[in-house]
Design a protein with these regions (language model features):
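Active-site-adjacent bridging/hinge elements
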Residues: 44-56, 74, 110-121, 203-209, ...
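Active-site-proximal, structured, solvent-exposed surfaces of multi-pass membrane proteins
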Residues: 77, 331, 386, 395, ...
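Extracytoplasmic/lumenal acceptor-recognition loop(s) of multi-pass membrane glycoenzymes
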Residues: 7, 19-24, 261-292, 296-380, ...
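Soluble non-transmembrane domains of integral membrane proteins
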Residues: 1-56, 391, 402-468, 474, ...
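Periplasmic/ER-lumenal interhelical loops and adjacent helix-loop junctions
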Residues: 1-82, 183-225
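Short alpha-helical segments and helix-capping/turn motifs at coil-helix boundaries
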Residues: 61, 77-87, 236, 291-300, ...
Length: 572
């Protein structure tokens, strides 16, 4: 959650948008100082212009970013003015809310406050990025600026005092901008993330990129200074006119005042917004449809009507969502990805992709069910990867069937208990996942391992368990086993609202406790016999919300009826 913490000095982007370098891959333009330097050093024009479309100008401490939080130069000026002239508790409430928002957005840079909110304030730990709390400041700062304008329009402050406070607010905001416009070189424009690329380019290009960062600060500092000066002039003009000529064309003056400010704010904000969310980010409907058009490899895979998963090696596996459009993907991207699944990607899946590709190349896409081959990517087999999509020449893709996929569920002979999650994760590449499972010792009771009355776990040729029906929120299985056995389900374990039942012929349900094995998967002890199993997702929060909504609607109807009935009786 703290990976996207807003830097303390990065807060200057409220006032100077490109203070921190804009975005991770920023388009500095063909007319930039960097582009000219590259051409002067013999780089072909086209290559220089292409490079300048994706320059590592961002110098903050986030892994990457698509743009800064820019409040607006005029908004910052009005906010500071509001702190000086707005009386009463509203000012202090808005100031405290703004400061809290900024402090929480700092995340790991103010860890004691972040940990306090993360651990003790409900729902706060659901935020993916702590900097998203800056939406509060994006409301409170303009709101205090509006209250400042109200003070000026309503003439609730003496002209001399107002003029002095206007110069103070303008001096603080415009003064900061002017200082960095004149002395931008005093800012350290290096970053700890520069090590990822700085040794891969010549020294002159490295220095040119650093100079471009400085130039970006200087240009935007001048820009903000000019907008503050213009905003100051408009506010000063209106306040001066209202005090020296209070009755002359007052309504038209007010319209001109608000109109001029609105135009200036839009002129300030819109160009900055378009830097990071411009016309290039919009896609035509026909282009979007073409992106999701059925591919030959998808047609081939979809002929298989069994239940399986696919790993797409022909794309950016863990940052691509297209594969999941038609296929059940092991990869893909989600902002709400479970941490344990990300661990599985980092520690196993990403490391098994290269051996998988080597096996595909060695077998020329025809993998035979040889036990020794499948041992190179056991976790992918555990996740029921029946197909791998591999790249071909000419930008095409082809599916390769994996005969080592372990299926949707299976019985194991032994469950190994460990003390820590690290041990559990590490053992996945060491044990035989077909016959063994590894679990945290806190699940020992749920797996019935510690209960002496349970028959020792053994595997029989007669034992079988298979998935018979699939839906995202309901999976049905059929099991046949002569003794109590641990079944491992190739489904990601989630501790809330998932329930496993044995369904008898008369429809009665008996719940079985679910446990976590193999770091991420679900497991349960299946009693001896022939059973129909149902695994259902039953979110209690949604059910509770439905009842609450029904009660509220009923209460609303009764209230409306109680209010209208006397009127109806009186009219009758």
């Amino acid at each position: 959650a703290t990976a996207w913490s807003y830097g303390v000095d990065e807060t200057m982007t409220f006032l100077i948008p490109n203070w921190e370098g804009g975005a991770s891959g920023y388009n500095v333009g063909e007319k930039s100082q960097l582009c000219e330097t590259m051409k002067d050093n013999g780089v072909p024009k086209r290559s220089a212009e292409q490079f300048c479309q994706q320059v590592p100008t961002y110098r903050g401490e986030k892994a990457f970013t698509s743009g800064p939080v820019y409040m607006g130069a005029i908004i910052c000026f009005l906010f500071v003015l509001g702190l000086l002239i707005v009386p009463g508790p509203y000012k202090w409430a808005l100031l405290v809310a703004t400061l809290f928002s900024v402090a929480l957005a700092w995340g790991r840079n103010m860890m004691w406050l972040t940990e306090l909110f993360f651990n003790y304030f409900p729902m706060y730990n659901k935020f993916r990025a702590v900097e998203s709390i800056l939406v509060v400041a994006e409301i409170t700062m303009p709101l205090l600026g509006i209250l400042a304008l109200q003070q000026i329009v309503d003439k609730k402050i003496a002209w001399e005092k107002l003029r002095m406070n206007m110069f103070i607010a303008g001096g603080i905001t415009a003064g900061l901008c002017l200082f960095f416009a004149l002395f931008a070189s005093v800012v350290d424009v290096t970053s700890s993330y520069d090590a990822q690329w700085v040794n891969q380019v010549p020294a002159w290009l490295r220095d040119a990129i650093f100079d471009e960062r400085t130039a970006m600060i200087k240009a935007d500092a001048w820009r903000s200074f000019i907008f503050i000066a213009l905003g100051f002039a408009v506010v000063y003009w209106y306040a001066w006119k209202s005090n020296t000529q209070p009755l002359a064309s007052s309504p038209y003056r007010l319209i001109a005042f608000y109109g001029a400010l609105a135009v200036l704010v839009l002129a300030d904000m819109l160009p900055v917004n378009k830097r990071f969310f411009g016309n290039d980010h919009f896609v035509k409907a026909k282009d979007a449809d073409a992106y999701f058009a059925m591919q030959p490899y998808e047609q081939q895979i979809l002929q298989d009507e069994s239940y399986y998963r696919v790993l797409n090696l022909a794309t950016n596996t863990f940052n691509d969502a297209r594969t999941s459009y038609r296929l059940k993907s092991i990869g893909g991207y989600s902002a709400a990805k479970l941490r344990r699944y990300q661990d599985l990607i980092d520690e196993h899946i990403s490391k098994e992709m290269n051996p998988l590709m080597q096996t595909v190349m060695r077998t020329q896409g025809f993998m035979l069910p040889d036990e020794n081959e499948g041992k190179d990517f056991p976790v992918l087999n555990m996740l029921n990867m029946k197909y791998a999509v591999v790249p071909l020449q000419g930008g095409k893709q082809a599916p390769v069937q994996n005969p080592y996929a372990m299926g949707n569920c299976w019985f194991v002979d032994e469950v190994i208990l460990v003390d820590t999650p690290d041990e559990e994760c590490a053992l996945l590449s060491e044990i035989d996942l077909h016959k063994q499972a590894v679990a945290d010792k806190k699940f020992a009771e749920a797996l019935d391992i510690t209960k002496p009355e349970v028959t020792p776990l053994m595997a029989f040729d007669e034992s079988s368990i298979e998935l018979t029906s699939y839906a995202p929120n309901c999976l049905q299985y059929e099991s046949m086993n002569e003794r109590n056995q641990v079944a491992v389900f190739s489904e990601i374990y989630y501790p809330y609202d998932w329930h496993l039942y044995i369904v008898n012929n008369n429809g009665e349900k008996m719940e079985l406790p679910l446990a976590r094995v193999n770091y991420t998967l679900r497991a349960a002890v299946i009693p001896a016999g022939h059973h129909q199993l149902v695994m259902e997702f039953q979110p209690h929060a949604i059910q509770t919300d439905k009842w609450c909504m029904a009660i509220l609607i009923l209460a609303l109807l009764l209230s409306v009826g109680g209010l209208t009935y006397p009127l109806w009786r009186k009219k009758k």
